[in-house]
Amino acid sequence: LNLFTDPLVKSGQSDVIRQLAERLKQEPNATGMTVGNEFPQYAALAPGHTHPTRSECTIDEAQTWLETMHNAMKDQWPEGRFWFGFDDDLWFVDNHPFTPRHAVTQGFATTVHSWVFAQVGPRFGEGHPALTWFPRYLLELARAWSPDPKRPLWLQEVGAPRTHVPDDNAAAFMTTTMASLASTPGLEAVTWWCSHDVSRDLLDFPELEYSLGLFTNDGTPKPEALALAEVIPDLHNDQPQHQRDEPLEFSANWDTGEGRSVCSPTGDLFSQWVDQAERTGKAPRLRRV
């Protein structure tokens, strides 16, 4: 059954969302819910990313699915906030049916997931500044696509995978990354992924999942947790910077996303962006033309 187009499946998905919304809205500190995690991966087309039981859909069908899920939640919880979680294929793969347009128009805010193990780390290598600039680049890319300059941003996933960030550099990686984010216009929240390491008693996880936490699986804070605690007050006090430099431009189709691959971390645009960020100490703007 197709996860995005089959009427029975969509009915079941909508019902789950309605029931969750009905229960969660009773909690005094709950403000909304996210459909995730990276559900559009089931429609992915990129080599190496294609799901073994892929659910094929068109761009219009992806749009309909997003709207259906959003409406199910809003019907039950009108005052709640609703988000979607997208992996970065959405920003970089030309023929992905989920497009940047979807990310910047659906839900309460634009969410970004930043992982350096996929493309940035393999291209630039351990310790390269591109790794700590990558989350900010994604946020600037999201801003470039958005028709609303005031649309909120949420860096929903960012972490220090030990495949490219060794233990002795994890704390510095975290503080440098967070420093690059603090001045981002519209950024409302950052979620460091994740809270705790996965226990080695749990088998069959990818190796990097066992060491992503701010805490060990028994609750001991790791160096990056202690470093984060120290910088949080500064992060709260930092103000977004008005970016005056001329933006770096790229061309991509609003409706289909065709051309978005030029923004990939394997391309020249990202290299130019990182070089300028390192030279000036400020994140360059991006502009879609």
Located regions from the model:
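Active-site mouth of glycoside hydrolases
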Residues: 1-102
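The substrate-binding groove and active-site-proximal loops of carbohydrate-active enzymes
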Residues: 2-12, 39, 51-62, 121-133, ...
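Aromatic-rich peripheral "rim/lid" segments of glycoside hydrolase catalytic domains that contact
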Residues: 8, 13, 184-289
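Generic structural signal for well-ordered alpha-helices
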Residues: 14-21, 63-71, 135-143, 174, ...
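Conserved, mostly hydrophobic/aromatic
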Residues: 20, 33, 73, 110, ...
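Core-facing hydrophobic residues within beta-strands of well-ordered domains
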Residues: 27-30, 107, 187
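Glycoside hydrolase catalytic-domain groove-lining segments
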Residues: 59-60, 75-163
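Histidine/acidic-residue-rich catalytic or RNA/ligand-binding cores of hydrolases
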Residues: 164-178, 202-209
